[in-house]
Structure formats: C-alpha cells, structure tokens
Amino acid sequence: TPKPSSAASDVYKRQVITIAIITTIVWLLTGHEAGYALARGISVLVISCPCALGLATPVAIMVGNGMGAKNGILFKTAVSLEEAGKVQIVALDKTGTITNGQPEVTDILPADDVSENDLLTLAYALEKKSEHPLAKAILEKAASLGLTAQEVTEFQALPGNGLSAKLGASTLIGGSMKYINTLAAVSPSLMNQAEKLAEAGKTPLLFAKDGKLLGIIAVADVIKPDSAQAVKELQNMGIHVVMLTGDNKRTARAIGAQAGVDQVIAGVLPDGKESVIRSLKEKGKVAMVGDGINDAPALTRADIGIAIGAGTDIAIDAADIVLMKSQLSDVPAAIRMSRATLRNIHENLFWAFFYNIIGIPLAAGVW
C-alpha cells in the first residue's frame, strides 16, 4: 500500500512535467527560438527539483521512528506512523492490556474466630492440587508469607463450583459463593462482603472446614497502575475508548469503571473480537490493543493493530505498532507521536509547495 503522503509527490511530478512541456510549446508558438523555449522548459524542471518535496516525508518519518524507538514504541511501517494519528476509536482487550494479566490476592477476610494465616494455610492445602488460574494467586500469596501446605487426600475439582478434599479426618471445601452456600453455614455479613467484592470486579472464593465457613479470599486481575491515566489521555485527545472482555457484565462493568472507559463490551468470545472490531469500524477509524493469541485476528482487522510487547509472538506479528515497555500509557504516546509527525510532514510540504508556487512562474517567464 503506498504511503498516503506520497500521493502528493506523484501528482506534483506529473504536473511539473506537464507545465514544462506547456511552457516550451507556448514560447515556440509565440515566435521565440527553439533554444530559448527549451531553456524555459528546462528551467521549470530545474527550479521545481522535488528535493525539498521528496525529503519532506522521509525525514519526518525517520525522526518519528527514531523518537518512537527511543521511547520503546516500534512503528513497523511508515504507513502505521502516519495513520495512527487519525484513529477515532481505541478498543482495549482487558486481560494483559488494561489489567496485569496475572490474578493476585486482593482481600483476605477470615471469620471471627479464624486468623488470616489459618485461612490462607487451609486454602493453600486445598488449592495446591488445583490447576485453575485463580489457584496460582493463592499459592503465590501463601508462599510469599512463608506458609507451608499440608497434604490433602481425596482431592476433587468440580468445574464451575469449586474444590473439595480431606485433611486428616476433616473435609475442606472451597469455591464460589453459590457452591459453598449449599454446603456450609455462611453468615449474612460475610455473604454481604462477598457480594461487594464481586461488584468490585473481584472473584470471592469461600473456604469451609467441616461445614463451618473459615472466610473469604478475593482474587482479581487488577488493572495496571497507568491504565486509568492512559484512558483519560485518550479521551482528552477526542478518542472513544472501548474495553473488550470475555467476563460477565458485572465484573466487566467494575473493571471498566476503574479504568474509566467510555464503553464496555462484555461476554466477547475469543473468536468474536474480530467481528466486534468490524462493527466498530463502521463508526470510525479503529485501533485495537491486545497481547494474546486470540487478539491476532482483531489486530489484523483493525485499521491500526497495537501489540503489548510482553504478549505472544502471534499478536506482535499481527500488529502494526509494538509497545516494547508493555505500558498502556504508550498508546496515547504513540498517537501523539503520529500526530506530531503528520503535522511536521504537512509543514514541510507547505514550504516545499510555497517555494515552487513562486519559483515555477519565474522560471517559465510568466513574471
């Protein structure tokens, strides 16, 4: 695809050649010698030498690419550097883009007669054999506190509900509010706290021993420190910010509110992001920001694909721009850089054309 700014150069070259030919013919038809007429035509070509015009875009692109690389923003092509500044909508994948992509323990709420360490120790023993992504957060938290996990037996994972196992003669269970509520006595106050955690976009995991609730451990994929500021900067630039996620609406709304996005599209399946981008493109020029394998089709479909540097190779290959620092704040920085480069190109082209508007008539003998 030719660079947008190269179109002006192509038109200019054709027009200059046409003007030179017309100049030569006019001087011949007005009775002047062929040498004089030819000299006028050649003068037009010489004075309109497109050096300034030819350098207007490449120099600005080179400087823009250099500044981008210096700041950890890689523009793969000149087109991506020129087009990023025209973006009207930015679609952000939630996991790994707005959030850290690594669930972590955010709250530990033990029952009245249970300590935090006791709750974590029993949760550690139960979750140690789990392969669920949320289990990793609890294991890391317990390990960071120097806790040790006791060995459990008769371990069972119940997809969509939770876990159960035997610890000596006792039965341990852990999982969702709905699951634990059917097997253990949950106080109204703890249930209320669990609801509030869920409304805040966190996942409350309840743990019980022999039918007695031990407490709640909340796990969440927290947003990056710079996410909210990056979203605000994009909005201040007149850009509509959309968050895409496969989460349920309640969790998605909570994360979206923390980040401050304009629109939340929840329940998006991994293979459904491309169709969402297609529909967004009907409203304006779209940039998609993502980091995962399932983001690659959407990155390709968007007008500008922006990949987080810490993401998968497939996402990076599919993108037009790569943020090497994996910071969301580099998205508005990349767009600002593109706009500054475009502004520089337009200024360079203006002065190049201004010179020729004055010089060509002089060379042609009009003045």
What role is predicted for each listed range?
Residues 39, 52-126, 280, 290, ...:
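Conserved catalytic phosphorylation-site environment of P-type ATPases
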